Amino acid sequence: MSESHVKISRTIIRGTSPSTVRLESPVRELEDLLDLERDARVRSERNANELSIQLDTMTERLDELSGTSSQTQDAIRRKDMEIANVRKDLENANAAFETAEATLRRKHNTMISEISSEVENLQKQKGRAEKDKSQLMLEIDNVLGQLDGALKAKASAESKLEGLDSQLTRLKALTDDLQRQMADVNSAKSRLAAENFELVRVNQEYEAQVVNFSKTKSVLEGQLDDLKRAMDEDARNRLNLQTQLSSLQMDYDNLQARYEEEAEAAGNLRNQVAKFNADMAALKTRLERELMAKTEEFEELKRKLTVRITELEDIAEHERTRANNLEKTKVKLTIEIKDLQAENEALAAENGELTHRAKQAENLANELQRRVDEMTVEINTLNSANNALEGDNMRLKGQVGDLTDRIANLDRENRQLGDQLKETKSALRDANRRLTDLEALRSQLEADGDNLASALHDAEEALKELEVKYVASQNALNHLKSEMEQRLREKDEELENLRKSTTRTIEELTTTISEMEVRFKSDMSRLKKKYEATISELEVQLDVANKANASLNRENKALAQRVQELQTALEDERRAREAAESNLQVSERKRIALTSEVEEIRSQLELSDRARKNAESELNDANGRISELTMSVNTLTNDKRRLEGDIGVMQGDLDEAVNARKAAEDRADRLNAEVLRLADELRQEQENYKRAETLRKQLEIEIREITVKLEEAEAFATREGRRMVQKLQNRVRELEAELDGEIRRAKEAFASARKYERQFKELQTQSEDDKRMILELQDLLDKTQIKMKAYKRQLEEQEEVSQLTMSKYRKAQQQIEEAEHRADMAERTITIKRTIGGPGSRAVSVVREINSVSRGNRATSIM
């Protein structure tokens, strides 16, 4: 230390001052900082352009979503119109079924009454035939009786002919009714065939759409798997970060132990070193808390995604079961499905974009985390550099103490130095006041240090340049170079072991921080007591100097000129000290500026985290909409199945109608055959009547033949009567069976009506689901607008950051100019005093030592 002082003193005496060289390196460093600030401004402008591009894309998406909402509203209006049409069709079908049932009942009642009347007539005819038989048996004995019997037979045959004519007319009317029913059945068959063809076509369209939806679902499932893999990668990155943090903690513990060893050797100034270490430890713990918070956020996000996946699977299974009940609505939902398909494509594109943005946000978070780790390493490096500079500060303060002793010895030689000592006392008081101001400034710097992490992203390149500046400062401080190189080598060797555990050292770190805080407080109290003791000692020395000055006043008249020279030298020293203090203030302001920049970097990091969280929320919203689309696809699949079942039921109804038609045709054929048979019988009866006329003319000749014919007629009438009764009974049974069939068809019609009512209710629920989907789209639109506002706000904040950076650069440049001006003034003053010999040259060398040490400390603080 003494050799360096001698070297500096000799240099001053020779007239070669290195202040210019020392000032050039801070100027170059500030120019580098200016370049870095320009680069940061370019990056901020680039970020602003990117944010404006994102704002334009979000505006376009907002327009697309508004168009999609209008299309959805149109689809809902069309669906309401279709529901009204279905309701009208249902009412018309119910009315038609009721009228058809009433007419069928009336027809069956009339047919039953007619058949019963015919049976009664046949029974009456049978009775008449028996009476005729008895009369003919009586007329065998008497020809006249036979003639009367023949006349009665003629009358009965005529009445029978009239009955057969009336029966023929009734059968014709029944045939006409059956033909009309057959025509109605044919029309219903054609209508059902057309509906069947339409249902088949719609079914094919739905099958094609279901295939498309299945492909979309597979794509979305692949995206979900990608997200799961990304979450696993994030977990692995988190584990790597924890190992890195543990290794950094171990490095910090080693450095702390080394620092304590140096603090024991350093003496009273160890408290300040502990203070700076406490500040760095607080910053490190804050970064660790932020890292743990981010880790917990990643774990919570992973857990939420897992729960969401299970919920989506359950919802998908539930919606598959629900979809089986909605397949019958495919005919009226074709237009809506096309609209939904277009919306699905838009949502798929949006989902892809959101997934890409989420991946970008995750990459950005990983990059920021890596930068935080690099910043932590560089902060540790700067901490070690700060420790070295504090050692220099201790040595400089020791030199200041030596200079104070020299000043006291010089004051003892002259009584006029008492006033100078009083001024020195006031200067020391000012120094104490400045110390309190510096402590307040330190507290302010600590508060500003909390805002330092927000500017990490923009200060990445600046911190790399700081590392280069640190190397330059090592070159400037040659007496510290070997020690710093050794520490750097040790740090490089220890960096390989700084990545294993973090939970083991967190508690030790907290205890160390608390101990360092207690140590800092105790050191501050000791420093305060030391300065108070120094002040008291200076007061005692002042009294002694006053006494010595009173005794030396008589002896030092010849030294008056020398005292004046020493007084001027002391004034120069005071001015140099003030210049050093101003330089210290400049360096403190620069430190505050750098602290504010780090706080801005931290705020930008928080903004990026918020953007990542927003992207994750958008991804969750997109996943919810994907699940809703999956449910709608399953619903449409179930609608398809239900419509296929309805088609099968309608096909069965069509087969039944065809069978009924065939049965009606068979009945019509049987009735036609019966009409022909009755016509033949009528002709036979006419022939019998003619034969009876001929028999009446030949009664006397052919009595036996008439008897035989009468017996044959009796047998024929009995046989035909039995046959007619049996035939009519069969007809009654057939009509009863037809009545049962019509009743069954009426019940089926009522069942189909209830089925249509259920379909109507299902359509209502579907329309409500569509309305709910529209509300969700509106909420998504509102969220998008909020995000646009947030992006605009971030853009404004980036502009404010760039403006603050330029203002800081202007302030730094102004401070550099002021420092250069003060350095020039000091060099001119030293040049003036250089020609003075004797003790004056020694005072100038002392002043030069103080200036050189203070400027070296200022250059180190700037770096």
Swiss-Prot record:
One Pfam family linked to the record: Myosin_tail_1
InterPro entries: Myosin_tail, XRCC4-like_C
Residue ranges that the Swiss-Prot or TrEMBL entry lists as coiled coil: 27-836
Record's keyword terms, sorted: Coiled coil, Cytoplasm, Motor protein, Muscle protein, Myosin, Thick filament
GO cellular component entries: myofibril; myosin complex; myosin filament
The keyword Coiled coil is annotated on this UniProt entry: yes
Chain intervals for the UniProt region annotation (Nonhelical region): 1-26, 837-863
Location in or out of the cell: Cytoplasm, Myofibril
Domain of life of the source: Eukaryota
Annotated family: Belongs to the paramyosin family.
Assembly: Homodimer.
Free-text function comment from the UniProt entry: Paramyosin is a major structural component of many thick filaments isolated from invertebrate muscles.
Cross-referenced PANTHER family: CINGULIN-LIKE PROTEIN 1-RELATED, MYOSIN-6-LIKE
Protein name: Paramyosin
